[in-house]
């Protein structure tokens, strides 16, 4: 077993369809039921903002470059300063890359550019950041040296916030 299955988070007897007729929410647990580490970031993003970005496309194509039309269920984030073309998909763009353990990871452009903008101004409405700046911030290195990274310096439980 390499990670959580569908029923770890979703209730198999509730609908996950996004409409007004769906019964229940489809979720039976939240991230904080298993994870207790808080993030060192502003108060806006929640866990799924970064760890479940809209990096997946179904039959609908969205013109926004860093956003698919459905949320991915690849929770791991590749913290290297590489974008989707070099760090998430194969050269043809037809498959998600896997590491030696068979795990995939979303790249920082998907995880961060839904809120931040790249150097061309593409992305969300917040500050412009390069992939290197995003990587340095997440890891707590470079201009962010000594900060400990986005997860590590905050040791208190989320319930204590």
Model-predicted segments: where are they?
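Inter-heme linker and motif-flanking segments adjacent to c-type heme-binding CXXCH motifs
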Residues: 1-157
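Short, solvent-exposed mixed-charge patches
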Residues: 159-161
């Amino acid at each position: 077993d390499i990670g959580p299955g569908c029923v770890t988070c979703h209730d198999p007897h509730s609908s996950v369809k996004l409409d007004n007729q769906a019964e229940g929410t489809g979720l039976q647990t939240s991230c904080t039921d298993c994870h207790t580490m808080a993030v060192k970031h502003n108060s806006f993003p929640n866990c799924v903002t970064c760890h479940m970005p809209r990096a997946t496309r179904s039959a609908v194509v969205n013109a926004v470059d860093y956003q698919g039309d459905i949320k991915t269920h690849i929770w791991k984030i590749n913290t290297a300063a590489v974008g989707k073309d070099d760090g998430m998909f194969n050269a043809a763009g037809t498959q998600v890359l896997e590491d030696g353990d068979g795990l995939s990871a979303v790249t920082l452009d998907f995880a961060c550019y839904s809120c931040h903008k790249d150097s061309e101004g593409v992305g969300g409405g917040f500050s412009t950041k390069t992939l290197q700046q995003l990587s340095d911030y997440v890891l707590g290195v470079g201009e962010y040296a000594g900060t400990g990274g986005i997860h590590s310096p905050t040791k208190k439980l989320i319930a204590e916030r």
